[in-house]
């Protein structure tokens, strides 16, 4: 049995994001919240998405991300001199890459499409890896960030809500295996060619 912990729940509101000379609406930078958060079929109460053609919906209701990956992304920014912090040993804050759930105990190679995360009061089902867009480049501060996400596999994964309820930061969950035919890492691999350009 695989178990993990929900360390942070992160919510965001749609706001302007500068992408080059353009200003686009985005909710990518999310903030950790304290207290129970209601989980509905379309996601977490109080969380927003700007472009519903590519974000949100039943199969992308919640975005989960291994908390340890934030250190990798901070290092990418430091390497390119776009660090948020002067200290190179600090990691980016939870929610920075747009994740709703900051998790420990799972990585993309150990999570499969169809697996279920059983929390005390709700059940979430793994649906697909995150494939980043240009807004991710803007938030990270360098033009190859989306490519680096796909190449590194440090992408996180989307979840559908199978049983509505509530989530609480700090609670544990159990990973219940599905058919185990394709891991998140395997599902992301075919997208690497697209992001080589």
Question: What do the predicted segments below correspond to?
Answer:
Residues 1-119, 123-135, 177-196:
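Electropositive, beta-rich accessory/interaction domains or terminal extensions
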């Amino acid at each position: 049995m695989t178990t993990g912990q929900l360390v942070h729940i992160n919510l965001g509101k749609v706001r302007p994001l500068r992408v080059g000379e353009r200003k686009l609406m985005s909710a990518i930078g999310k903030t950790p919240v304290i207290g129970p958060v209601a989980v509905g079929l379309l996601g977490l109460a109080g969380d927003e998405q700007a472009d519903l053609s590519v974000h949100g919906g039943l199969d992308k209701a919640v975005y989960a991300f291994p908390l340890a990956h934030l250190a990798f992304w901070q290092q990418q920014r430091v390497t390119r001199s776009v660090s948020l912090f002067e200290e190179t040993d600090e990691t980016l804050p939870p929610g920075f890459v747009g994740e709703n759930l900051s998790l420990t105990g799972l990585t993309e190679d150990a999570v499969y499409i169809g697996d279920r995360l059983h929390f005390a009061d709700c059940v979430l089902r793994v649906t697909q890896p995150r494939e980043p867009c240009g807004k991710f480049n803007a938030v990270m501060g360098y033009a190859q960030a989306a490519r680096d996400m796909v190449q590194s596999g440090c992408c996180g994964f989307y979840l559908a809500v199978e049983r509505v309820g509530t989530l609480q930061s700090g609670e544990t969950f159990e990973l219940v295996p599905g058919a185990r035919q394709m891991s998140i890492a395997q599902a992301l691999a075919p997208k690497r060619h697209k992001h080589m350009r």
